[in-house]
Amino acid sequence: MFEKDKWMSIGEIVAPQGLRGDLRIKPSSDFPERFTKPGKRWIQKTDELPTEIKLTKGKLIPGKSIYVLSIEGVSTRSSAEEIIGWKLVIPIDSRPMLSKDEYHYHDLIGLEARSGPSKALIGYVTDLIKGGNDLLEIELVEGKKVLVPFVKEIVPEIEIKEKWLLINPPPGLLEL
């Protein structure tokens, strides 16, 4: 049986590259070696078991946040097109250890967002948007989505094991 919480997406196959079966990958990982170091990986179609593959080479396209990967057995453009939309996944227990105040994307999604001295529930983390300053997408309990800067001053406390984080928003941030 497939256990969804034992796997973590590190990227998505978004397009073929050229005629020889190379693949464009949009990463959702901050660890470039996952896309450049040859070896065993897994790809997964939505709601199916991951399939083991062998990454033969990979490189970052200069000036873009896209990797081009070569996978053993995918040697034509049409075979590459068949797996567009599939995820590149890894076993969740193979994640690298992080320093204090560093978090895996997968661990943040679904956390309760709390606010104020009473730490009242205000919503849930639904996404992390990477950029110059990362943003947490929070779906508020009333259904509206807001973007919150993911900085210590606004998100001073994160309790991964207890599945919540504290937000101290500046006035008006949650009303936007």
From Swiss-Prot:
Record carries keyword Hydrolase: no
Classification via InterPro entries: PRC_barrel-like_sf, PRC_RimM, RimM, RimM_N, RimM_N_sf, Transl_B-barrel_sf
Domain notes: The PRC barrel domain binds ribosomal protein uS19.
Domain PRC barrel: from-to ranges: 100-173
Keyword Nucleotidyltransferase: no
Gene name of the encoded protein: rimM
A Pfam family annotated for this UniProt entry: RimM
Superkingdom, natural source: Bacteria
Known role: An accessory protein needed during the final step in the assembly of 30S ribosomal subunit, possibly for assembly of the head region. Essential for efficient processing of 16S rRNA. May be needed both before and after RbfA during the maturation of 16S rRNA. It has affinity for free ribosomal 30S subunits but not for 70S ribosomes.
Family: Belongs to the RimM family.
Gene Ontology MF, one: ribosome binding
GO CC annotation: cytoplasm; ribosome
Summary of subunit composition and partner proteins: Binds ribosomal protein uS19.
NCBIfam families referenced in this protein's UniProt entry, alphabetically: 16S_RimM
Organism: Prochlorococcus marinus (strain NATL1A)
Protein name: Ribosome maturation factor RimM
Keywords of this entry: Chaperone, Cytoplasm, Ribosome biogenesis, rRNA processing
HAMAP family associated with the record: Ribosome_mat_RimM
Single GO BP term: rRNA processing
Localization per record: Cytoplasm
